[in-house]
UniProtKB/Swiss-Prot annotation:
It is found in: Secreted. This is Potassium channel toxin alpha-KTx 13.2. Has the structural arrangement of an alpha-helix connected to antiparallel beta-sheets by disulfide bonds (CS-alpha/beta). GO terms for biological process: envenomation resulting in negative regulation of voltage-gated potassium channel activity in another organism. The record marks K18 as: Basic residue of the functional dyad.
Length: 28
């Protein structure tokens, strides 16, 4: 989960998770 205020799901699986412009992004 990206946390509160962050929507969407990660297209890539990774350990680093960031919330950019309210969207969830994962990085390997």
């Amino acid at each position: 989960a990206c946390g509160p205020g962050c929507s969407g799901s990660c297209r890539q699986k990774g350990d680093r998770i960031k919330c950019i412009n309210g969207s969830c992004h994962c990085y390997p």
